[in-house]
């Protein structure tokens, strides 16, 4: 039986040696509303910016974020960008950076200009030298890599074709790892898979796979056939082809392919998703899992990564919710116990760029009218918070005979619904304090209210949010249901 907790415990004992092209990823977010008078070029009104460790460094960050240790070997230039990356990697408790400085080249830096509203990339500017490292730098890289192999449980080569993974570095690293019985995973960039000869697993995306195999790779059967030929040439044990929204196909050498569909998710940014896949594959395989388990974990991690803005990492809690989607339906996870806990959830969602919705009510006896409102509310946002009147609040509003069910029971019923992400119980007569704290992007109520009657509408409108009124279902209300029950009517 699969145990996610046991897997996490095993992951925490693993050390991954990651070698590859380090870079700095910068994201400048803004909007374009006019053309420059100086040239036919859009003017970006910058609203904010983010800086992240990218490339193979993002692989290392994902390895560490999921709970394993990472020894990272990469190349930097003698510049401010390189020194910044060295400092940032050094501050990560689970990453041990071993960086080689090459004063003849700049540290790779990529700046992306992104539409804040649409999450679309408008422009990218690169600072880089992509030529292979010189012979003396190659030797320094190998001097950094080879002594670390004995400490590693698995080796991961992250090739961005920026000069670190030369043919010699690849060859000597794989040969030395094999002598020590270490498995090697390669996220390839070269169209010549033969240079990765002897690796355990190659993880190309569909475009890279098509270029390397000169096959159409239009169907899973075509991918499987071409992969067998490529594996014979590269002498590797398996090939995993990532296919974006079409999922992944893993082909073991001489075995039956395994196909995993992509998990449904709102894609915000695909930057670094391949890094996440490679990192999770490495740590899960190192932990002793089989191909299928590692592949499904990687697919779940990719779904989390692409739902975030920028170059992102995946945490164990996020992976748990994707691998075990029903685990997050437990009442103790969805029912908020304090303002501080609510703030922490909101902080995480906003960091991921998610649209937060809010609705509220007594929900004393759940009926189809409630379900319609909750379903419509969830459809208008990424995460839905339900404000629930406490028992004392219900008594003040509905009379001493209410509620029929106490607040904990009502909260647990709401928490069991797929449409509901959080339940927050409030003591006041109205949810105004909650709405002020949450500042939702969308506020939802039943259509028996007007927009002006919805508590908190002015707060939401002031922040540029929306107020959604959902048509009520005639004949369904808790008050009428209670009255009919007391009269013995059905």
Curated annotation (Swiss-Prot):
Keyword field: ATP-binding, Carbohydrate metabolism, Kinase, Multifunctional enzyme, Nucleotide-binding, Nucleotidyltransferase, Transferase
One Pfam family it belongs to: CTP_transf_like
Coiled coil: none
Annotated GO CC locations: cytosol
GO molecular function: ATP binding; heptose 7-phosphate kinase activity; heptose-1-phosphate adenylyltransferase activity; phosphotransferase activity, alcohol group as acceptor
Catalytic activity: D-glycero-beta-D-manno-heptose 7-phosphate + ATP = D-glycero-beta-D-manno-heptose 1,7-bisphosphate + ADP + H(+); D-glycero-beta-D-manno-heptose 1-phosphate + ATP + H(+) = ADP-D-glycero-beta-D-manno-heptose + diphosphate
Residues the entry annotates as binding ATP: 205-208
Enzyme Commission code: 2.7.1.167, 2.7.7.70
Catalytic residues, chain numbering: 275
First-tier enzyme category under EC: transferase
Superkingdom as given in the UniProt entry: Bacteria
Region of interest called Ribokinase, as start-end residue ranges on this chain: 1-330
The keyword ATP-binding is annotated on this UniProt entry: yes
NCBIfam families: cyt_tran_rel, rfaE_dom_I, rfaE_dom_II
Family: In the N-terminal section; belongs to the carbohydrate kinase PfkB family. In the C-terminal section; belongs to the cytidylyltransferase family.
Role of this protein: Catalyzes the ADP transfer from ATP to D-glycero-beta-D-manno-heptose 1-phosphate, yielding ADP-D-glycero-beta-D-manno-heptose.
Name of this protein: Bifunctional protein HldE
Gene name per UniProt: hldE
